[in-house]
Amino acid sequence: MEGPALNAEDLLGPDGEDWRVPVSELEHRQGELAHRLREAGLPGILIQHPIDLYYYAGGRQNGALFVPAEGAGGSKDAGGDGPVGYVRRSLRRAVHEAGGDDAPHEITAFPSLRVFAERLRERGVSEAPALQFGEVPSSFATRFSQALSGLGASSDGTGVVHAQRESKSTWELACMEEAAGVQIRMFEAVEAVGGEGVSELDLVAAAEAVSRSEGFAGQVEMRRYPLQCDRAVVVSGRSGGVSSFFDSAVGGVGPHPLSGMGAGFAKVKANEPVLVDLVHLHRGYVVDMTRMFVAGSMPKVWEERLEDMIAVKEVVVDVLDRGEHCSKAWEEGLALATELGHADHLMGMAPDQSRFLGHSVGLQLDEAPVVAKGFDRPMPLGGTMAIEPKVVHQEGCIGSEDTWTRDEDGLRPLTAGGAWPWVTTW
């Protein structure tokens, strides 16, 4: 293998920890994908999206991972060699991140696209693998579908991948629990520096310092275009009533028009609600939590609104806990919010209202299913979801949010839950 020598000790996490995805995880994921491909009637798939390369191959190097369906051409069941990673750069890092000598798949240099289909054919592949048409840019997908046309037409495998990633493994949940521990320290930092006269951006900076020191890489991954999100939304008073381009309850002013959401230069004023919505990622895995702060005392009208949103949250949790559909949780949550007089302010102000009460999280912030109309299925076992009913008025916003998971016993919070108060006073 050509190129500079790779010292594995240079690629460790804090205090010498090995932060690679365990080989056993990669092996199980690839096997499960092969099974799901067969069930979907697809001969195989070419994984090219960076997030999914990390999920299946252990790293997001520039390349692609071919995974054949169970029993299909190229699979070990059919006499082939099984999954193979084709890497442009960095090949050495790809080998290391996949487990080195223990990697569950072969890793080799990416051939010229002119001969790519032939290289797959040499591995026993007789049909064009599916591509991630729902994830990668159209021009990129077209280039590969044309290169593979000698094997036939490529189908879309996006849904198969998304469906598999909905249920998290024990290891993934442990990553999210680790993230939640860091997140508590982020809220503690906001509590320590906050008060009347402190800017929203200064509050974000305090939380950001904790998150960065614990390994946050600076990017919150999104599934929906334009793939942009501010990982810390802190809005005080009237800033909380400003809508933005982002499909969420709370917009925020932001520092300038290109970053027109989240924290801006507004300063905390006495007795005004300050909403703090913080995300932390541990080894790529997202947890999302919102709490309220106030310098002085929270006005009674805002206290009542918060109590109502906590009641809506409890309804949503109860429905999902029973294993009923996410759409049912939306219907019942919306019905209670409407009954309590919040129809025009739930998850934003008309006409800029978001139509959901919870969103799944994982390696991306906006995964499925969602507590919204049309998601006529339960939250899956192993699913992880941020549940976040909020109300927005011109003078501010209020609500709560925790990230939950569902197991055989029902829902349980991964983030603080009742361990951090709904309102913290400076």
Regions found by a protein language model. Name each.
Residues 1-426:
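Active-site neighborhoods and metal-handling regions in enzymes and metal-associated proteins
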